[in-house]
Amino acid sequence: MEILLFNTRDELLRVSLKHVVYFESDGNYTHIHFSNGAKATLLYSLSNMEHLIDEKLRGKVQPFIRIGKKYIVN
């Protein structure tokens, strides 16, 4: 199971990539939409998020694909 860790202002957020449906860009923020309907917002650009995903999944099959400037979908 691949997990990304993010320090937010209030907590350490663990994001399991298998539960992510898509990432959505909103300027310098990225909204993460999960399969259970939950949503998290992080102060990361979509380009930074794409780089983190690529680094985490290096050498593995990558189920995520970038769609234009606004989305990365699973």
Segments (PLM) and residue ranges:
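Basic, polyanion-interacting recognition surfaces, primarily
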Residues: 1-74
